[in-house]
From Swiss-Prot:
Disulfide bonds: none annotated. It comes from Alkalilimnicola ehrlichii (strain ATCC BAA-1101 / DSM 17681 / MLHE-1). One of its GO terms (molecular function) is beta-N-acetylhexosaminidase activity. It comes from the Bacteria. Keywords: Cell cycle, Cell division, Cell shape, Cell wall biogenesis/degradation, Cytoplasm, Glycosidase, Hydrolase, Peptidoglycan synthesis. It is found in: Cytoplasm. This is Beta-hexosaminidase. Belongs to the glycosyl hydrolase 3 family. NagZ subfamily. One of its GO terms (cellular component) is cytoplasm. The active site is at 181 (proton donor/acceptor), 252 (nucleophile). Pathway: Cell wall biogenesis; peptidoglycan recycling.
């Protein structure tokens, strides 16, 4: 059975009978988890085991676990600082900053994999230019080359733990002020301006064969009239064509306000797939899932080949064994030595 094109959210900490039925639909390919789905590492493992047991090959299980404001699982997990704390370290000592980024990526990935989560939508490849509050300290740095350097460390840490990385939000969300969860951002710059700035990390990481990319719900109005998620130009011509990207392309959540440009939820899902996405996310609208499934295409063998590469391959798949590792203990100590993360949670 191939992985379908929809990644859907769940309502609680256990699967309902209705969710079990939906997750067996051939056009479903994955689940994205949030803090509402989490109580403890033990409960999380029971949930992921139940999801993975439904199908063969198993459904993908993902989460946004970046650190700082975007860390869905907290109780029992290492509290990761926001990636932006690495900017000051990088400015003093790039090698130390990359080593810390590697630690953060490895620690995040190891803990998730030990609980049965396949991958995190990370790292953020946007520039932290002080323009976008929703990106803010989720970004590594304001300078493209620094973002590339630090992101490569983070991705290598994830890979060492057995997790595939997914960069976001292509082709760059850090230079627009509006929050795409609430409204549709519009970037007025010419393509040449993006080439020397926001596009640099995506171009470089695409060349590194990053396994996954997530698109931005942003219109780059001097370049293309559609948000990147629904744009054949951005996904087909630029990402696949110019950048030669061969990994899986994910839409950002289709329930966000910025995605309304494409119409009702079923139409949004279809438009994102027609633009070139391999999988679309519907995180917070369970009532819309049946209609969305009716509008989605059947699973595609090429997309399936891209998506199955995101299944977790944990080096350590047991929570207690992980905590006994000297490497885990030392990584926790180094990461906790960084600046404290801001309180609160950003729902993205």
């Amino acid at each position: 059975m191939l992985l379908g094109p929809l990644m859907m959210g769940l309502e609680g900490t256990r699967l309902s009978s209705e969710e079990r039925t939906l997750l067996c639909h051939p056009r479903v390919g994955g689940v994205i988890l949030f803090s509402r789905n989490f109580q403890s590492p033990e409960q999380l493992r029971a949930l992921t085991d139940a999801i993975h047991a439904l199908r063969r090959p198993p459904l993908l299980i993902a989460v946004d676990q970046e650190g700082g404001r975007v860390q869905r699982f907290r109780e029992g997990f290492t509290r990761l600082p926001a990636p932006g704390v690495l900017a000051a370290v990088y400015d003093r000592d790039p090698a130390q900053a990359r080593a810390l980024s590697h630690d953060m990526g490895w620690l995040m990935a190891s803990e998730l994999l030990a609980c049965g989560v396949d991958f995190s939508f990370a790292p953020v490849l946007d520039l932290g230019r002080g323009v976008s509050r929703v990106i803010g300290d989720r970004a590594f740095h304001s300078r493209p080359e620094a973002v590339v350097h630090l992101a490569r460390g983070w991705v290598a840490g994830m890979r060492d733990a057995g997790m595939a990385a997914v960069g976001k939000h292509f082709p760059g969300h850090g230079s627009v002020a509006p929050d795409s969860h609430l409204e549709l951002p519009r970037d007025p710059r010419a393509r040449s301006a993006l080439e020397g700035a926001d596009l640099v990390p995506f171009r470089r990481l695409a060349g590194d064969r990053l396994p996954g990319m997530m698109t931005a719900h942003v219109i780059y109005q001097a370049i293309d009239p559609l948000p990147a998620t629904f744009s054949g130009y951005w996904i087909g011509e630029v990402l696949r064509g110019e950048l030669g990207y061969e990994g899986a392309v994910f839409s950002d959540d289709l329930g966000m306000a910025a995605a309304a440009e494409a119409g009702p939820l079923p139409r949004r899902a279809r438009a994102a797939m027609e633009a070139g996405c391999d999988m679309v996310l519907l995180c917070n609208h369970p009532e819309a899932v049946p209609a969305v499934l009716r509008h989605l295409p059947d699973p595609d063998p090429v997309s399936d080949m891209r998506l199955v590469r995101l299944h977790g391959r944990p080096v350590v798949d047991n929570w207690r064994k992980l905590h006994r590792l000297t490497r885990w203990q030392e990584a926790v100590r180094r990461v906790r030595g960084q600046d404290p993360s801001p309180e609160g949670e950003l729902e993205v």
